[in-house]
Amino acid sequence: MAVQVVQAVQAVHLESDAFLVCLNHALSTEKEEVMGLCIGELNDDTRSDSKFAYTGTEMRTVAEKVDAVRIVHIHSVIILRRSDKRKDRVEISPEQLSAASTEAERLAELTGRPMRVVGWYHSHPHITVWPSHVDVRTQAMYQMMDQGFVGLIFSCFIEDKNTKTGRVLYTCFQSIQAQKSSESLHGPRDFWSSSQHISIEGQKEEERYERIEIPIHIVPHVTIGKVCLESAVELPKILCQEEQDAYRRIHSLTHLDSVTKIHNGSVFTKNLCSQMSAVSGPLLQWLEDRLEQNQQHLQELQQEKEELMQELSSLE
């Protein structure tokens, strides 16, 4: 028997430039999870016929009649600095949430749109895309403050056993009170596919939550927005700051001998060089290629302008 689930959010529209920043952030660290916050707005689109679940290439009509479809639009993301690196867990401090809210207010003034923190994202390196019971409980806590709050997970560094090629899976979910019985509707999404999935998490009876996947649609953009560009450029700085913080904490210990300190310094230098090779170098090359492309496009527009001006002068 199917369980009727009332969703606070029916779909998520993620801008392609924000998606690019999330993907680069997730692929920047293979051993620990990374995290960030999503900035956007929540729109209520009135529908008189059916509820639509949006996917990357199609639109499916659900037989349930609704009055309004609540869609979360994610325009940009904020990369968070990790104070504690863990392989299987990430945490967002109240100070980071407050700083993100301040940034959202600044963006609202610049764009004239009701920007706010609408969700969070984190990575799952080498593990499944589905949220853990800790992720589901954390998401439920955020939804107590905002029912429209969503969570995104990027599963990376996954190798297909048949083709031996890497894959990146992603999902968007919310938490709801667990039902006595539920059933899975679809499977995970591999890049541009979409699905809806429900499963009960093994928690205490009085605290049980289940995840429900929210259909997500990547909105294509020809250009990258200024805010997302700033976030992409900020990524190497944040990774460097995290390495410096970790090195300073270890270096401040008084019981370390000279050999250990030299070893720690070598590891710190090695990590910085690895980041330059894996993150900073490709990012710089991408920015240079983008600049060259923009300059070429500018020349084409200037040439087109001159041709139009000549045609206009000939008509006069």
Swiss-Prot record:
InterPro entries: BRCC36_C, JAMM/MPN+_dom, JAMM_MPN+_peptidase_M67A, MPN, MPN_BRCC36. It is an enzyme of class 3 (hydrolase). Its EC number is 3.4.19.-. Keywords: Acetylation, Cell cycle, Cell division, Chromatin regulator, Chromosomal rearrangement, Cytoplasm, Cytoskeleton, DNA damage, DNA repair, Hydrolase, Metal-binding, Metalloprotease, Mitosis, Nucleus, Phosphoprotein, Protease, Proto-oncogene, Ubl conjugation pathway, Zinc. Changing L23R: Abolishes localization to sites of DNA damage and interaction with ABRAXAS2; UIMC1; SHMT2; BARAM2 and BABAM1. The modification Phosphoserine is found at S258. GO terms for cellular component: BRCA1-A complex; BRISC complex; cytoplasm; cytosol; nuclear ubiquitin ligase complex; nucleoplasm; nucleus; spindle pole. It is found in: Nucleus; Cytoplasm; Cytoplasm, Cytoskeleton, Spindle pole. The modification N-acetylalanine is found at A2. Its main location: nucleus. SMART domains: JAB_MPN. Residues 12-179 form the MPN domain. Changing A278R: Abolishes interaction with UIMC1 and SHMT2. Heart, brain, placenta, lung, liver, skeletal muscle, kidney and pancreas. Aberrantly expressed in the vast majority of breast tumors. Its cofactor is Zn(2+). The keyword Protein biosynthesis does not apply. PANTHER family: EUKARYOTIC TRANSLATION INITIATION FACTOR 3 -RELATED. Belongs to the peptidase M67A family. BRCC36 subfamily. Metalloprotease that specifically cleaves 'Lys-63'-linked polyubiquitin chains. Does not have activity toward 'Lys-48'-linked polyubiquitin chains. Component of the BRCA1-A complex, a complex that specifically recognizes 'Lys-63'-linked ubiquitinated histones H2A and H2AX at DNA lesions sites, leading to target the BRCA1-BARD1 heterodimer to sites of DNA damage at double-strand breaks (DSBs). In the BRCA1-A complex, it specifically removes 'Lys-63'-linked ubiquitin on histones H2A and H2AX, antagonizing the RNF8-dependent ubiquitination at double-strand breaks (DSBs). It is linked to A chromosomal aberration involving BRCC3 is a cause of pro-lymphocytic T-cell leukemia (T-PLL). Translocation t(X;14)(q28;q11) with TCRA. This is Lys-63-specific deubiquitinase BRCC36. It comes from Homo sapiens. The lineage of its organism: Eukaryota, Metazoa, Chordata, Craniata, Vertebrata. The gene is BRCC3.
